[in-house]
Amino acid sequence: MASSLLEEEAHYGSSPLAMLTAACSKFGGSSPLRDSTTLGKGGTKKPYADLSAPKTMGDAYPAPFSSTNGLLSPAGSPPAPASGYANDYPPFPHSFPGPTGAQDPGLLVPKGHSSSDCLPSVYTSLDMTHPYGSWYKAGIHAGISPGPGNTPTPWWDMHPGGNWLGGGQGQGDGLQGTLSTGPAQPPLNPQLPTYPSDFAPLNPAPYPAPHLLQPGPQHVLPQDVYKPKAVGNSGQLEGSGAAKPPRGAGTGGSGGYAGSGAGRSTCDCPNCQELERLGAAAAGLRKKPIHSCHIPGCGKVYGKASHLKAHLRWHTGERPFVCNWLFCGKRFTRSDELERHVRTHTREKKFTCLLCSKRFTRSDHLSKHQRTHGEPGPGPPPSGPKELGEGRSVGEEEANQPPRSSTSPAPPEKAHGGSPEQSNLLEI
């Protein structure tokens, strides 16, 4: 039966009018389209003309159909006049077997329907028995009662409550139950309950809660750790040896090496360690500290701790000053060496000859040039500060100076005492 229905649907193209014709042919009644077709063809005999509704379908249809809406007519009614559909829909060439009592009752129209329900009930003949049939039919045709008792019961009707979404309340199945009036059910998404204060919100405040800022013993680190360190009178912070107590802090001396926060960096040389061990007894020696190299066999002494640190980098091979020029990356021990190296990249000429206004990148180049003028040595740089860094000692500075010959002329102010112009040039 299902295969024949699918063939009929494919033949008529799923048109509502064609489906109506096929439904009417099942019931043995005459269709206006089929009658008009037979008249247009000149009295062609219909293969199902001898079938009558009271004889063949007496078991399923005890009463004839009502013809109030003109869609279905009883077997004895006269044929309808021909219409414009005669040529569009030729007669169906197949013959249908006579109806028997063993037909599927799910394909037939329910018995208690009125004439006003004829149009919706026509399509029920093409519908297969579906487990969800009673659900969507009840929602679409609210006035139609459910089908016969042998229709399979949907799986949700097996529950005693009738509605598995409801809280055990007896309601009808499907959409019909939702449309019925009754006590309001609780929503599917109830309002969230109030959680205790232990749960933090999803979007915390940009500032911490007040109870987290209160001081208490539960904090691991003491608050004194975050206090700023004391700054000396000179406004400078302590150096790398800040972990050690400042020198002279307990003596109260004001003229010591680092007493009363002089701002000088601490030193680890043997002399400074000895002065630290002596304490107040060496207060007189702190006025002029001497920093000596502790490397055996060196014994160099410097007046500043920074000079000693620069000297110690020669022993350790440390080169903390790196050239950041592209693809260079050279490292140097002192900052003045790095500065002199960078000028080779920038081509800066900061040393100028006072006589011919020539410029040079290095001071030794200027000194060599000034000897061509018959002058004793390099003049001071125009900017004022020395080219050499603080890390260079006095002995190293003297070693870098060009040697003076014994036959070099005397300074112009002595040789030419009466020429004030040359003396002013050299005194700048």
Curated annotation (Swiss-Prot):
Keywords: Activator, DNA-binding, Isopeptide bond, Metal-binding, Nucleus, Repeat, Transcription, Transcription regulation, Ubl conjugation, Zinc, Zinc-finger. One of its GO terms (molecular function) is zinc ion binding. Residues 30-84, 229-257, 364-428 are annotated as: Disordered. It is found in: Nucleus. Disruption phenotype: Death in the immediate postnatal period due to difficulty in breathing. Mice rapidly become cyanotic and die within 15 min of birth. New-born homozygous show severe inward bending of forelimbs and hindlimbs. They develop a normal cartilage skeleton but fail to form bone and to express osteoblast-specific marker genes. In endochondral skeletal elements, mesenchymal cells together with osteoclasts and blood vessels, invade the mineralized cartilage matrix. There is a cross-link at K55, K227 (Glycyl lysine isopeptide (Lys-Gly) (interchain with G-Cter in ubiquitin)). Pfam families: zf-C2H2. Transcriptional activator essential for osteoblast differentiation. Binds to SP1 and EKLF consensus sequences and to other G/C-rich sequences. GO terms for biological process: cellular response to zinc ion starvation; cementum mineralization; diphosphate metabolic process; gene expression; hematopoietic stem cell differentiation; osteoblast differentiation; positive regulation of stem cell differentiation; positive regulation of transcription by RNA polymerase II. A zinc finger (C2H2-type) spans 291-315, 321-345, 351-373. This is Transcription factor Sp7. Osteoblast/chondrocyte specific. It comes from the Eukaryota. Gene3D superfamilies: Classic Zinc Finger (3.30.160.60). Its main location: nucleus.
